[in-house]
Amino acid sequence: YQYSEELAAKTKAKPELVFHGAFEKMAKIKKGRHSVDGNKDFYGGFDQMPEIVPGVKGNSFQFSQDYDHLNITDKIIPSLEWTDPFSLSIWMSTDKRKKGQSQTLIANTGEKNSLWRGWEYYLDDQNRVNLRLINVAPSNLIHVRSVDSLKLNIWHHLTLTVDGSGKTEGVKLYRNGKEIQTEGVIDNLYKTIKPTRPDIEKGFVERKRDIIIGRSYSGFLGDYGLFIGKLDELKFFNGVLTPFEVQSIHSENSEEKEKIKWPVIQKHLVEKDSKILELKKQLKENREEYLKTYAPITEIMVMREMDKARPTYLYNRGNYSEPLYTVEAKVPETLPAMDKDLPKNRLGLSQWLFDPKNPLTARVAVNRYWQMIFGKGLVATPDDFGVQGQLPSHPELLDWLAISFSENWDVKAL
């Protein structure tokens, strides 16, 4: 739109506020369960509960124990799909920063036997803000991370928006009303992120799983991603907040009343235009259809190359604590060299194995078939064609069989 101000009369309200956790009070419902803010679907599931302390607005909850985390049932926030646009904001302050230990803010990811499927919003061991939408870790997911770390022992207003594209570029992270610089760690999501459980007959089936606050379901994190600090004013929206809305929500509980600039308002008006909203609705339907197309496709576990090969070493007598020098991906020098055009990976190795200039593959293969049929190979040491192995009993026959076999690798003809 050339003149965004023309949209002022057409603009719609902010996305639907699905849930507001004020972190004001707790009440015991029964043994081992407490409701939060009078909502039985927002609860603590153990006798340990967070401490109520002053917050940015009224009270906040101080998390400091192993089992003082909170849960939100799917009656409030249903299981999300990566095609679902959503936003959330929360005030937080932490005094924890420990190498190798993350801190879960809010998540519903499972553990290893559930493929870690779900979504998680957390701080890593450098207190960088992270979001992951996961089908199966570590391959089918997106992972976005802030570049800078959060300072300890001060309040931060964190906001997250996800546009439903399933791409890292569709994730925005904000701190105190302003977008922060991020980096895409992994960008490869194309299947569902709804929680799952193993099933003997069906493999994996969809299941309901509460959203968890202040702790992870995943034991592989070592400390279960325990959050140590204070949380306040959690808001969850069904849709994408614009930068204008993010700043507005931040100013509600902030002493900093910064004037919102006109370009931010213009962008907001464009995003809320009825035509734009209708196009986004159609786009969401197309993405859902795309997801349905991929859903029935069965995938199997195979090896894949690393993006960047890690160093490989020759070790002193095989002792992993005593590397002598690095080695490269090559073939034995006593055999024909690998073509320079071949990649130095498993594909290149397979092409080299069946290269007509390589005499070893066909000779070893026909010798093993001879051994399977007659009980003893033409070479009596089938595992050793080197200098310590035995010579072939009928070398000309072995040569003829190997040459004939390598012409088309036809086992039946052999």
Which positions does each model-derived feature cover?
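Primarily short, surface-exposed interaction patches in extracytoplasmic proteins
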Residues: 38, 258-413
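Extracellular glycan-associated modules
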Residues: 1-298, 307
